[in-house]
Amino acid sequence: MFIQLLILSYAILLQLIATQVADKQLPNLTKQCEPTSQTIYDFHVPTLDGSEKSLAEYRGKVLLLVNVATYCAYTFQYNDFNPMLENNSNGTLKILAFPCNQFLLQEPAENHELLNGLKYVRPGNGWEPHGNMHIFGKVEVNGDDHHPLYKFLKEHCPQTVPIIGDRHQLMYNPIGTNDIIWNFEKFLIDKKGHPRYRFHPSAWVQGSVIAPFIDELEREI
């Protein structure tokens, strides 16, 4: 019995070490998604003009999905999106942005106002999205009315931090343990439509945190 317990303890220790090593291979505030046979191609999302668009139109592309807001401390990241896409010479990368007003009401604009807000207010200075960046209609990413796409992403990609935030800043119910934590959280999708990585809003540094993961997925067949 003692030997069996010793072997079991050793096996558990090896598993813990393997898990710790795997975690250390990822930057802080980055999580790997769980494998799933379902893809984002099963979903339709609202556009700025009120119509619906199938995400199946993005087959074969590496996708960076991000929930955005105009009046957020992370809004400066918009200034990094266009250079990131310009440097993607093969055009494989697409950025899909989903405006959301659930975090301290930092996206109050109506759909028809969003692009002008970005152009003239924040980030301002005439900012317009690159041709490979698509800004969709407003959605909810948490709570009872979360969009099915975000329900799917949260089910298969673990939370990047143990604490979500202050309750009074979250404009939805109920609060879930795997909720989107704030504006500009990101999901990286491979060329077959599977979610692969989840990134905390602050895991950015002008896109340099995410760039190696994009390169990895672009190399995949």
Swiss-Prot record:
Any single biological process term in GO: response to oxidative stress
Cleaved signal peptide residues: 1-19
Glycosylation sites: 28, 87, 90
Keyword Acyltransferase in annotation: no
Primary localization: secreted
Top-rank taxon, per record: Eukaryota
InterPro entries: Glutathione_peroxidase, GPX_AS, GPX_CS, Thioredoxin-like_sf
UniProt catalytic activity: 2 glutathione + H2O2 = glutathione disulfide + 2 H2O
Enzyme class name: oxidoreductase
Compartments where found: Secreted, Extracellular space
Active-site residue numbers: 72
Pfam families: GSHPx (PF00255)
EC number: 1.11.1.9
Keywords: Glycoprotein, Oxidoreductase, Peroxidase, Secreted, Signal
GO molecular function annotations of the record: glutathione peroxidase activity
Gene Ontology CC: extracellular region
Gene3D superfamilies per the UniProt record, alphabetical: Glutaredoxin
Subunit details: Homotetramer.
Family indicated by similarity: Belongs to the glutathione peroxidase family.
Protein name as it appears in the record: Glutathione peroxidase
UniProt lineage: Eukaryota, Metazoa, Ecdysozoa, Nematoda, Chromadorea
